Swiss-Prot record:
Homodimer. PROSITE patterns: CYS_SYNTHASE (PS00901). PANTHER family: CYSTATHIONINE BETA-SYNTHASE (PTHR10314). This is Cysteine synthase. SUPFAM superfamilies: Tryptophan synthase beta subunit-like PLP-dependent enzymes (SSF53686). It is found in: Cytoplasm. Keywords: Acetylation, Amino-acid biosynthesis, Cysteine biosynthesis, Cytoplasm, Phosphoprotein, Pyridoxal phosphate, Transferase.
Length: 322
């Protein structure tokens, strides 16, 4: 009998489960299932690209453990995906990140031995990218993975996420709903799904406050991980059938409801994906259709954010009962 023990943590990436949404989907004429990427080894969809970008660079002979210094700007979860892979493979990693990202993300990155550089939150991801490029210019053996431009990002979703969803739904998926950060998930998984069935519709989700894919202007919002304020080069915009806008408040409310009504503790971007998918599943023309929404990350990573403000205050003010 073959051993089922993984040779290292990177072999645990992928094959995340799908689950129907029930109680939050009242009034829907279509069905909504969630792809639970918080079940990855480090609790987010970015575990896939962290591994794929490092492995791809290794295969091309661009980096070597113990020699190369990996550098990446990230809003957090890609950093974590890179960090555990770098730790397992023996790389030094420098991460630049806007100071507005949750404290949990900082702690996790530091726990993996990352050198963390915080950047001006007012400058968003552009500020983090500029700082990473500055560090790269003065770092011997430095290598930037460039998640927003790296073809290894959508490639891993084409090779794994898309096939997993197709197989998991027995090919019965009608719509794929994904928040757009780098655009890697919707581009890679979406391309695979459309190759299997050209009638599958792809729905991108972006913050209403920073709706650049819809022709709006970039702006501040609270949905960490999506709505970077620019159109990434790995995003194939032409693949997308419709962009659905959701507000930060709507996303936060839905993330809270998912915990209370579905038993799913998820991050704000999962709330955004769920809110968008439910809107689509309520349209009369979508009766009987199956929508799969990507839930990118686990809620525990957001305990210090606005998502859990009221809960945190309640927990902190509690006293013991005699």
């Amino acid at each position: 009998m073959a051993s089922r023990i993984a040779k290292d943590v990177t072999e645990l990436i992928g094959n995340t489960p799908l689950v129907y949404l029930n109680n939050v989907a009242e009034g829907c004429v279509g069905r909504v299932a969630a792809k639970l990427e918080m079940m990855e080894p480090c609790s987010s969809v970015k575990d896939r690209i962290g591994f794929s970008m490092i492995s791809d660079a290794e295969q091309k002979g661009l980096i070597k453990p113990g020699e190369s210094v990996l550098i990446e700007p990230t809003s957090g979860n890609t950093g974590v995906g890179l960090a555990f892979t770098a730790a397992a493979k023996g790389y030094k990693l420098i991460i630049t990140m806007p100071a507005s990202m949750s404290v949990e993300r900082r702690i996790i990155l530091l726990a993996f031995g990352v050198e963390l550089v915080l950047t001006d939150p007012a400058k968003g991801m552009k500020g983090a990218i500029a700082k990473a490029e500055e560090i790269l210019a003065k770092t011997p053996n430095g290598y930037m993975l460039q998640q927003f431009e790296n073809p290894a990002n959508p490639k891993i979703h084409y090779e794994t996420t898309g096939p997993e969803i197709w197989k998991g739904t027995d090919g019965k998926i009608d719509g794929f709903v994904s928040g757009i950060g780098t655009g890697g998930t919707i581009t890679g998984a979406g391309k695979y799904l459309k190759e299997q069935n050209p009638n599958v519709k792809l729905y991108g989700v972006e913050p209403i406050e920073s709706a650049i894919l819809s022709g709006g202007k970039p702006g501040p919002h609270k949905i960490q991980g999506i709505g970077a304020g620019f159109i990434p080069s790995v995003l194939e915009v032409d693949l997308i059938d419709e962009v659905v806008q959701v507000s930060s408040d709507e996303s936060i409310d839905m993330a809270r409801l998912l915990a209370l009504k579905e038993g799913l503790l998820v991050g704000i971007s999962s709330g955004a994906a769920a809110a968008a998918a439910i809107k689509l599943a309520k349209r009369p023309e979508n009766a009987g259709k199956l929508f799969v929404a990507v839930f990118p990350s686990f809620g525990e990573r957001y305990l210090s954010t606005v998502l859990f403000d009221a809960t945190r205050k309640e927990a902190e003010s509690m006293t013991f009962q005699a």
